[in-house]
């Protein structure tokens, strides 16, 4: 499993597709299409451009949150936030061949996701960001160190 995942976002000059293209051209092998406020049709349109780029670059293509749409589009998987569908429920819908990841902000979140069978866990935030609304408390290096120590002791 690859360790670094590019999560799409927009800036004043770069859109979702262009950002994904640049990340892939830079060697990224793992792209999550994250369009929180978009309609399913808007996500479909962006996916229609990004998914072939991922295939061309032999990269994993995930959708954020949208389990049914990930299945419809034959994405490689889905990333689920803390308030989204539970991992085990998504697994029943998608099956074992899909990658299912989840968001964690605490060690307890990591334990829950591990129990539910998440393939990977995105932990954060490491630092402040404006790309995410309702940001959880920043973990920083000390927070990560504490979580990693607890994971090691728990055998996760």
Question: What residue spans do the PLM features occupy?
Answer:
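A short, flexible beta-alpha/helix-coil linker loop
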Residues: 127-129
């Amino acid at each position: 499993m690859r360790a670094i995942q590019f999560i799409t976002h927009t800036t004043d000059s770069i859109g979702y597709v262009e950002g994904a293209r640049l990340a892939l051209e830079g060697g990224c092998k793992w792209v999550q299409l994250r369009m929180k406020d978009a309609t399913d049709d808007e996500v479909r349109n962006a996916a229609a451009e990004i998914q072939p780029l991922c295939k061309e670059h032999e990269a994993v293509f995930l959708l954020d949150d949208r389990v049914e749409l990930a299945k419809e589009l034959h994405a490689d998987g889905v990333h689920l936030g803390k308030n989204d569908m539970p991992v085990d429920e998504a697994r029943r819908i998608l099956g074992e061949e899909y990658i299912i990841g989840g968001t964690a902000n605490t060690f307890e979140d990591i334990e829950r996701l591990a129990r539910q069978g998440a393939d990977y866990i995105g932990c954060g935030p490491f630092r402040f960001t404006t790309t995410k609304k309702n940001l959880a408390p920043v973990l920083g290096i000390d927070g990560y160190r504490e979580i990693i120590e607890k994971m090691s002791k728990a055998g996760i």
